[in-house]
C-alpha cells in the first residue's frame, strides 16, 4: 500500500456536527477514505457507541483495518455504501442507525497516485476503478465501447459539450493502438476540444464522466440514499457531501421527495391520510459550503456542498 499521499477531509467539523453524535449511538461512515470524519466521530462517541466504515478501495480498507486495531468501537467493511442496507440487515441493525455520512467523489490519495489512473495531471495506467479487483478498467471499457456509448458517458456524466467530437477522436485513435495510459488519453481529448476553458484542463470533464461510469457512482448514490433511509432510526441524521452538480442534483431531489411525501397522489376528499404517504425526512438547516479559511488550506473543497436531513418515520 502506498502511503505518500495525504488527504484533507472536507467539511470535517461541519459534517460531524450535523450528525448530532450521541455517545451510545451507531453511526455509518459510508465513504471511509483515510478516516478523517471517522476519527472525529469516534472522538465524540462513548464507550458503548459503534462506528462502521464502508469503502470499496483496498488502500482505504487497509487504513480502516489499522484504525480498527486502535479502536474496538470501529469496524471497516469493504463494500460500497450502496450495499449498506444488506450489511446492516446481516448485523441486525436496520432501523437502529443514528447517523449516516456520505462524502462523495474521489479522495486525494486516489487522484494524486498516478498508479490509480484517475488523473490526467500525472501519467499512469488508465484504470480509474475504486476497487481495482472488480469490473472493467477505463482502458478495457474504452477498447470495446461504441462511439455512441463513449459520447453518452462524456456528455451525460462529464457534462462535456464536445462529447461526440471527443468520442470520435477516441474511436479513431484506438484503431491504431489501444489506450493504456492516462496521458495518452488526455492528449487525444485535448486535441479534440476546440474551446479550452481558462484554468481548466480540456480533458477534465471527459475524465470525470469516464470515472463516474467506470465506478457506477450515480447508480451507487441513488441506491445508497435509499439504503441510508432504510437503516436510520427515527431521529437519525443523513449528511451528504457532493462535489459536482450531477451528485448534488440526485441528493437534492431525493431529500425533497422524502420531505414532501406523497400525499399529493391521494384523492383530495380522502378523510384520512395514510401514514405511508407522510414525509419521511425533514431538512436540517440550509446547504453548507466550505468556509474561506478551509478553502485556503484545501482548494479542492471549493465545489463541496453538504445537505443534511433527519428521519421522521
Swiss-Prot record:
Swiss-Prot/TrEMBL GO biological process terms: rRNA base methylation
Pfam families in the record, alphabetically? Methyltransf_5 (PF01795)
Primary residence:
cytoplasm
Which terms are listed as keywords in the entry? Answer: Cytoplasm, Methyltransferase, rRNA processing, S-adenosyl-L-methionine, Transferase
User: Cellular location of this protein?
Assistant: Cytoplasm
What are the disulphide bonds in this sequence? none
Residues binding S-adenosyl-L-methionine are 35-37, 55, 81, 103, 110
Q: Which InterPro entries match?
A: RsmH, SAM-dep_MeTrfase_MraW_recog, SAM-dependent_MTases_sf
Please give the catalytic activity noted in the UniProt record: cytidine(1402) in 16S rRNA + S-adenosyl-L-methionine = N(4)-methylcytidine(1402) in 16S rRNA + S-adenosyl-L-homocysteine + H(+)
EC class (word): transferase
Superkingdom per UniProt: Bacteria
EC identifiers of the protein? 2.1.1.199
Q: Which GO terms describe its molecular function?
A: rRNA (cytosine-N4-)-methyltransferase activity
For this record, the Gene Ontology CC terms, alphabetical, are: cytoplasm
Q: Of which family is this protein a member?
A: Belongs to the methyltransferase superfamily. RsmH family.
Protein role? Specifically methylates the N4 position of cytidine in position 1402 (C1402) of 16S rRNA.
The protein's name in its UniProt record:
Ribosomal RNA small subunit methyltransferase H
* Organism listed in the record: Azotobacter vinelandii (strain DJ / ATCC BAA-1303)
Amino acid at each position: 500500500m502506498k502511503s505518500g499521499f495525504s488527504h484533507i477531509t472536507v467539511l470535517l467539523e461541519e459534517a460531524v456536527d450535523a450528525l448530532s453524535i450521541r455517545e451510545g449511538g451507531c453511526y455509518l461512515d459510508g465513504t471511509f477514505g483515510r478516516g478523517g470524519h471517522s476519527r472525529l466521530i469516534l472522538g465524540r462517541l462513548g464507550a458503548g457507541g459503534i462506528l462502521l466504515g464502508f469503502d470499496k478501495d483496498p488502500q482505504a480498507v487497509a487504513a480502516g483495518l489499522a484504525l480498527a486495531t486502535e479502536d474496538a468501537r470501529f469496524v471497516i467493511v469493504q463494500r460500497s455504501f450502496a450495499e449498506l442496507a444488506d450489511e446492516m440487515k446481516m448485523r441486525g441493525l436496520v432501523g437502529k442507525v443514528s447517523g449516516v455520512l456520505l462524502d462523495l467523489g474521489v479522495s486525494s490519495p486516489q487522484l494524486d497516485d498516478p498508479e490509480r489512473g484517475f488523473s490526467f495531471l500525472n501519467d499512469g495506467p488508465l484504470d480509474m476503478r475504486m476497487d481495482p479487483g472488480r469490473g472493467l478498467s477505463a482502458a478495457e471499457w474504452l477498447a470495446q465501447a461504441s462511439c455512441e456509448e463513449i459520447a453518452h458517458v462524456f456528455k451525460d456524466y462529464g457534462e462535456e459539450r464536445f462529447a461526440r467530437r471527443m468520442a470520435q477522436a477516441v474511436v479513431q485513435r484506438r484503431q491504431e493502438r489501444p489506450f493504456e495510459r492516462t496521458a495518452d488519453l488526455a492528449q487525444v481529448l485535448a486535441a479534440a476540444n476546440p474551446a479550452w476553458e481558462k484554468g481548466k484542463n480540456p480533458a477534465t470533464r471527459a475524465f470525470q464522466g469516464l470515472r463516474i461510469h467506470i465506478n457506477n457512482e450515480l447508480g451507487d448514490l441513488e441506491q445508497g440514499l435509499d439504503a441510508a433511509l432504510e437503516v436510520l432510526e427515527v431521529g437519525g441524521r443523513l449528511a451528504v457531501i457532493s462535489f459536482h452538480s450531477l451528485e448534488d442534483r440526485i441528493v437534492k431531489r431525493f431529500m425533497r421527495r422524502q420531505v414532501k411525501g406523497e400525499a399529493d397522489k391521494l384523492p383530495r376528499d380522502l378523510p384520512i391520510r395514510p401514514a405511508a404517504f407522510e414525509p419521511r425526512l425533514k431538512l436540517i438547516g440550509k446547504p453548507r459550503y466550505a468556509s474561506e479559511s478551509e478553502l485556503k488550506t484545501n482548494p479542492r473543497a471549493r465545489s463541496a456542498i453538504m445537505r443534511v436531513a433527519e428521519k421522521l418515520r
